[in-house]
Amino acid sequence: MRISVRATIPPLIKGIYPSLRPLILGHQQLQQRIHFFRESLRNLRSTGSIAPSSRFLCRAIVRKIDPHKAKVVVELGPGNGVVTRYILRRIGPSARLYIFEINDVFIEKIRATFNDPRMTIIHDSAENMGNHFREIGIEEVDYFVSGIPFVMLPELLTEQITNQCLSWLRVGGRFVQFHYSPLLLGLYRRVFGNLKLEVVALNIPPAIVISCEKLSPANQSLISHS
């Protein structure tokens, strides 16, 4: 049974609840950050960060999503679901969000946090996305949003996953990735043929949002030969 914070407050202090609410919410956010920090230390290779994404980073990421074109959105490595919340706010009521996550703790956290019929959680690695897409009946993806720490993974695996993203994207669709270093910019440019960058300083640590569009074969050929 879900008990609201308001219902647990004695009647004598209900009148000052509005002034207490920021403190209560601040405590909840602190607990979430501590939870993320502990889990990240245990699984730093798969999480890639010791702090959840700031609201400034989340907003920069979802600005790359056109809600009118976002019918199928795939999130890779959502962590504890901070970016997930912003994606669900951004996309329309008929859109679908598919999430790939391998960490059991984060999956349970996301399931407990969100009750949204548009969202499907897939407990598997992103490298196996093709099998799941074919099973579900997905023909193409409009947007990939990735928080996978590719800089900590073997380059061959990174290329395999990003090439799969490219093959499943519709022409004009986007792959959106955030990182904390520019080490893999050359790889994304090589795979997608283009990229745009946005630096988000108000994050711990400062982050880079990378956006790559799937070009038409003709445009891709022009870039390859330029």
Describe the function of each predicted region.
Residues 200-226:
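Core SAM-dependent methyltransferase catalytic element
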Residues 70-79:
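Conserved class I S-adenosyl-L-methionine
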Residues 106-136:
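S-adenosyl-L-methionine
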